[in-house]
Curated annotation (Swiss-Prot):
Pfam families: DHquinase_II. It comes from the Bacteria. Substrate binds at N74, H80, D87, M101, T102, R111. This is 3-dehydroquinate dehydratase. NCBIfam families: aroQ, PRK05395.1-2, PRK05395.1-3, PRK05395.1-4. It catalyses: 3-dehydroquinate = 3-dehydroshikimate + H2O. It comes from Nautilia profundicola (strain ATCC BAA-1463 / DSM 18972 / AmH).
Length: 163
């Protein structure tokens, strides 16, 4: 199974910008850690980062043609105003987890509202780079449960066909 991780604006600057908020870990290191954990659990993982809303919308939509089973997304600042990203997530109808490294509820008022939190499977905030790891654990669990449900349904259908 395949998971796509989408990083929004300014996340390419991790380890450089606002280290007091986001810590010293670079995006490449977060991706390497996630890749290792995904492989240990038998999952394929791919990463995408853009500072542009339309490109992120394209990346979400392209998930359907790439046989992606689930999306982990940190929309960053776009969380708070991108109806386009919200609509793209709804359109692809894939299990999606929203990630934020900082606790957005403890930050500026404008960061308190997420336009996607009500349409995703869950939201993980405030654990720094570990937020991504927690999101990956959650996504693996969700996808394994979906797989088991499909297998059980297929088994039940096969038994029903025998009768």
């Amino acid at each position: 199974m395949k998971i796509k991780v989408i990083h929004g604006p300014n996340l390419n600057m991790l380890g450089i910008r606002e280290v007091n908020l986001y810590g010293p870990m670079k995006l490449e290191d977060i991706n390497k850690n996630m890749e290792a954990f995904a492989k240990q659990n038998g999952f394929e993982i791919e990463f995408y980062q853009s500072n542009h809303e339309g490109d992120i919308v394209d990346a979400i939509q392209e998930s359907l043609n790439e046989n992606v089973d689930g999306i982990i997304i940190n929309p960053a600042a776009l969380t708070h105003y991108s109806v386009a990203i919200r609509d793209a997530i709804k359109a692809v109808n894939l299990p999606t987890i929203e990630i934020h490294m900082t606790n957005t509820a403890a930050r500026e008022e404008f960061r308190h509202k997420s336009l996607i939190s009500d349409i995703v499977a869950g939201t993980i905030t405030g654990f720094g780079p570990f937020s991504y790891h927690l999101g990956l654990i959650a996504m693996i669990q969700i996808l394994n449960e979906i797989k088991m449900a499909k297998e059980a349904q297929a088994k039940a259908q096969a038994q029903a066909n025998k009768q």
